[in-house]
């Protein structure tokens, strides 16, 4: 067994579960039989770039994105962000002009038709997809948006609440949500500007996001769930331990429910299923034993996936 990990990212591709084990690599598990299929390490023939895996995600085109914590080597591609296409690894470029601007700690990855996004220790970064009509085409680093106000990106400063971006999610055409340790931002990736910033009143180690209709739900540790209306550009009242939706302010996970208009929130309070339309609680399970409910681990959930009828 592997215990007391700081994180254990998970991704599911059909019948295969990819489980990231920081310091070891990626464990492959058969989802139907629970058998261990393989363990990818840097010493394996597939040559996983680094064993300190922080984040995993299946990308828009079906590849596996792997974000790791690596050495700041200054190389064109330091191996912190890699893509497995089913037969080969592709290392995404990480070199940014200037001193000590290269991202080398990758906390979250996501993608859409426009590109790949990563939350890093140097901001929220975007890569353009290779040209599918050119076999020699490679990923290109579009920009990294970071803290400070001098403009220019690439370490120059773009007005982000913090350079440590721990969550990235596309939330609309050319719009990227970036959650940081000190707040959140919305980035227009088409013109490279930070268009909305929310500064937290406390440091947070997580910044989860879920979008339903025209509202963005932001889950933070220590702060509860902040809500932002995209149409009006205004903040709604937050959901925390005093609002009756959550029993505690520490939110570690947000994920869409199986029914439209529902959302699961996880944290120190356990798991809560929320009806977003009526702003009511549909189910609430504490950590540990629950009468007429499941027995949950005694720790706050770090990742949640729903596949078919299983969470």
Language model: regions and residue ranges:
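Short loop/turn segments immediately following the C-termini of beta-strands
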Residues: 22, 69-71, 76, 121, ...
């Amino acid at each position: 067994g592997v215990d007391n990990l700081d994180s254990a990212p998970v991704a599911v591709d059909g019948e295969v579960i990819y489980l990231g084990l920081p310091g070891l690599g990626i464990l492959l598990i058969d989802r139907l039989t629970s058998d261990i299929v393989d363990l990818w390490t840097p010493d394996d023939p597939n040559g996983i770039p680094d064993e300190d895996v922080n984040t995993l995600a299946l990308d828009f085109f079906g590849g596996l994105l792997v974000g790791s914590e690596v050495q700041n080597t200054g190389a064109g591609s330091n191996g912190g962000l890699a893509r497995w296409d089913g037969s080969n690894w592709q290392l995404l470029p990480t070199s940014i002009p200037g001193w000590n601007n290269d991202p080398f700690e990758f906390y979250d990855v996501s993608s859409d038709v426009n590109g790949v996004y990563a939350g890093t220790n140097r901001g929220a970064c975007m890569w353009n997809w290779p040209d599918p009509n050119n076999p020699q085409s490679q990923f290109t680093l579009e920009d990294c948006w970071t803290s400070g106000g001098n403009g220019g990106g690439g370490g120059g400063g773009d007005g982000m609440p913090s350079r440590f971006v721990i969550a990235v999610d596309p939330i609309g055409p050319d719009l990227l949500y970036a959650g940081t340790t000190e707040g959140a931002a919305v980035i227009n990736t088409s013109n490279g500007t930070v268009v909305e910033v929310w500064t937290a009143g406390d440091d947070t180690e997580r910044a989860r996001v879920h979008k339903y209709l025209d509202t963005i739900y932001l889950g933070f540790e220590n702060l509860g769930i902040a809500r932002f209306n995209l149409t009006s550009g205004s903040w709604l009242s937050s959901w925390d331990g005093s609002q009756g939706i959550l029993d505690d302010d520490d939110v570690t996970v947000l994920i869409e429910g199986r029914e439209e208009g529902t959302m699961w929130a996880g944290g120190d309070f356990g798991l809560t299923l929320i009806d977003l339309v009526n702003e009511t609680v549909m189910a609430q399970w504490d950590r540990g034993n629950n009468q007429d409910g499941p027995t949950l681990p005694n720790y706050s959930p770090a990742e949640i996936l729903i596949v078919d009828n299983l969470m």
